[in-house]
């Protein structure tokens, strides 16, 4: 198959299988981590973000979920909701399916490892530009803010940056959305992508789960921002590609089936390692998001 034919086939997959990155809990945990970092060092950014979201065209959605909350509790919840908003509006006019990923083949065949499919890179740049433009409509800047939050989270999920292509998945497994696994012998089959969206999720209430992830998330030292947000973003994506290639796929390829009835069982050690990786990537995303927001909304 030619590269053009392969790209066209992949685009049809992308249209048919929208991919989520992290579950709500993961995105919300990232928002909490970013909020806590800003609350300790850059409270002006929090106030500016609150004021901007007040101009959001989907403000009613936020207001309904913030009802009864005040002070820091309300602010923390707002950051959770901003981070997940692009997933909440999948069925609305604000949806952009291709903004959630930028995929490259990282394991298997080498012939097609060059092309990167998706629009996350251009969407991140576009929304940063809108957010930085103080002459833009406040409603547009508020939407852009939500997408900046979300894309930072999305692109820390390894299967939103890298996927598999080999004889078992000749058109790729499209970041695991075409592959099936089971977390344990008695678990139901799930898409491999879904497994990597939710490795750190807790059972029960998603807000409680997000708080638990944020509390447990590994927050290693992250390099200070370079001053070039796009260059920093490209480094984060490269990290996710490496995690996909070195951690997500190698020990799971034998378990990944191409339909539910062929879903293999992931080793318990793999499931636990995925949880730790998920918590680490969510922690890194939250810390980096806080740095980015502090730069975007400096104190006067």
Each model region followed by its residue ranges:
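Bacterial N-terminal signal peptides that target proteins for export
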Residues: 1-7
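N-terminal signal peptide c-region/cleavage motif recognized by signal peptidases
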Residues: 16-18
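N-terminal, motif-rich segments that launch catalysis or mediate targeting to/interaction with membranes
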Residues: 20-151, 158-300
């Amino acid at each position: 198959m030619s590269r053009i034919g392969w790209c066209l086939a992949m685009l049809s997959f992308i249209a048919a299988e929208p991919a989520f990155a992290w579950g709500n809990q993961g995105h919300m945990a990232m928002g909490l981590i970013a909020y806590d970092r800003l609350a300790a060092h850059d409270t002006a950014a929090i106030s500016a973000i609150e004021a901007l979201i007040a101009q959001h065209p989907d403000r009613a959605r936020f207001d309904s979920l913030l009802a009864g909350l005040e002070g820091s509790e309300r602010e923390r919840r707002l950051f959770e909701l901003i981070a997940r908003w692009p997933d909440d509006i999948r069925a609305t006019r604000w949806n952009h399916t291709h903004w959630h990923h930028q995929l490259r083949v990282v394991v298997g065949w080498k012939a097609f490892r060059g092309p990167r499919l998706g629009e996350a890179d251009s969407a991140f740049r576009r929304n940063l530009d809108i957010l930085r433009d103080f002459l833009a409509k406040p409603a547009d800047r508020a939407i852009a803010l939500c997408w900046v939050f979300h894309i930072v989270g999305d692109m820390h999920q390894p299967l939103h940056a890298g996927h598999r292509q080999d004889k078992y998945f000749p058109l790729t497994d499209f970041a695991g959305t075409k592959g099936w696994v089971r977390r344990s012998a008695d678990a139901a089959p799930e898409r491999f992508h879904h497994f990597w969206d939710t490795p750190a999720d807790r059972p029960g209430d998603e807000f409680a789960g997000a708080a638990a992830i944020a509390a447990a998330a590994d927050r290693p030292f992250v390099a200070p921002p370079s001053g070039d947000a796009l260059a920093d973003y490209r480094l984060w994506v490269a990290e996710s590609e490496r995690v996909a290639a070195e951690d997500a796929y190698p020990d799971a390829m034998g378990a990944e089936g191409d339909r539910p009835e062929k879903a293999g069982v992931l080793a318990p050690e793999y499931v636990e390692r995925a949880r730790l990786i998920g918590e680490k990537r969510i922690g890194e995303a939250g810390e980096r998001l806080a740095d980015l927001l502090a730069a975007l909304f400096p104190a006067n």
